[in-house]
Amino acid sequence: MDIKAHNQPFGPAYFRKYYLNRATRVTTAAEMGARAALIAAILRHAGIPVHGILDAGCGLGLMRTAFAELLPRARYRGLEASEYLCARFNWSFGSVVDFRPVKPYDLVICYDVLQYLGERDAARAIVNLAALSRAALYVSALTLEDWRSNCDRSRTDRNVHLRSGLWYRRRLRRHFRHLGFGVWVRRNVTAIVWDMERPAP
């Protein structure tokens, strides 16, 4: 379901509204830091070492500082499709749909990116996320269920493609196992997770 036709320039006005303006922002550095702490804790608990992080669609890089403290040995790389942010923060320019580095990363972050892609590109992006990730993936995307029940619509960007959570999970499960809270691990990776700690099937 498309709320509006997708034609979103990710320039200064977009990031001022959704990330910098206290009255309209969708998240804060503190919230993103807590999210990074959760991701790091789950991977540590599962016994998955992290030496390289790719933040695909990193925006302002709000998780970078937290990861530097939580995973000090991990190299962080920000990937952005916004030329404005790449120029400002020196991120790597590219799309999660087809970006291919020389080597995959232990942890790939894809936070609030996939809903900006049409169905074909979103499906391609999930396949590419599997190629980008050596071990783990954190993914979050605004879903139809979130739009109906969870998000603050006065702050949430309407210029997106809404799909069910099931649509994403079905495609992710071809490559990953879900550890919970949006953290997935590659199917060939050994991760010790007790039965009652796993998400319900």
Model-assigned labels for residue ranges:
Residues M1-K103, L117-R124, N128-A131, A135-P201:
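Class I (Rossmann-like) S-adenosyl-L-methionine-dependent methyltransferase catalytic domain
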Residues I109:
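A conserved beta-strand element that flanks and buttresses the S-adenosyl-L-methionine
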